[in-house]
Amino acid sequence: MKHFWKILSVISQSTLSVILIVELVIGIIGNGFMVLVHCMDWVKKKKMSLVNQILTALSISRIFQLCLLFISLVINFSYTDLTTSSRMIQVMYNAWILANHFSIWIATCLTVLYFLKIANFSNSFFLYLKWRVEKVVSVTLLVSLLLLILNILLTNLETDMWTNEYQRNISCSFSSHYYAKCHRQVLRLHIIFLSVPVVLSLSTFLLLIFSLWTHHKRMQQHVQGGRDARTTAHFKALQTVIAFFLLYSIFILSVLIQIWKYELLKKNLFVVFCEVVYIAFPTFHSYILIVGDMKLRQACLPLCIIAAEIQTTLCRNFRSLKYFRLCCIF
């Protein structure tokens, strides 16, 4: 029975590793495609809209995030006996926090931008923000930078505190028990800072719903028939924000699981599972943005046609080869 569970564990880890690699590849391809399309459009038109600037920055941050995760996984699984000092751990945490921070905050700026562009309120403060949407995005990013600096400082203080506590009993290198407990504390700290963009995104989401409801109620009183352009824009923005929240919830869930069962961080199967769940957010959210953007969708269409033609050609060649083998047998 013990042998059976060992085989099952190996199969599960191999399956999750394949899923993880596939997620990494398609995530880098999707985000790289967005950067390429927007940069080509920028070279062609000599200018880039605010939405495209945010989408490009978001894609670049997620490419960095996915590449960083890939390097981290290679180091963890290829060099299991590698001795890590407290300074190395701090560098790893700072890079991880930096990648997550920009990926989440730029996505939050995108939801704020959608809200200010599409929502319709007669409130004077809202109109003030709506007319100064670029400044709102700039201030949001500036606040996020201040929070990033504070997050990194507190994380470094946390790792230094654990180092000083355990330095009396063990060497300067990190034991697996120490690393798991330190990782749990860092994740708790990270969750606290992640709550700020969550609250901001949730607020814009609820206000978008309220704006859609008031607009729909107003339209029912004056116009009979299908949706107007503003209602359609509301629905598209809501679909994008809902998809963002679902994937973001999965990301938060992966972090909470690591906090709840931090002692399992010593097991490779649990680590790979958490990474598979964690990567779903930066990978699949990029494809949702591609589907929701007309320019990206149109640019992606020729690639889909080429891929379909390649698949058809491969299937035809496979059938021809199979038929040739049957003829040779008979």
UniProtKB/Swiss-Prot annotation:
Keywords: G-protein coupled receptor, Glycoprotein, Membrane, Receptor, Sensory transduction, Taste, Transducer, Transmembrane, Transmembrane helix. It comes from the Eukaryota. InterPro entries: GPCR_Rhodpsn_7TM (IPR017452), TAS2R (IPR007960). GO terms for molecular function: bitter taste receptor activity; G protein-coupled receptor activity. It is found in: Membrane. One of its GO terms (cellular component) is membrane. Its main location: membrane. CDD domains: 7tm_TAS2R14-like (cd15019). Belongs to the G-protein coupled receptor T2R family. Several bitter taste receptors are expressed in a single taste receptor cell. Putative taste receptor which may play a role in the perception of bitterness. This is Taste receptor type 2 member 117. It comes from Mus musculus.
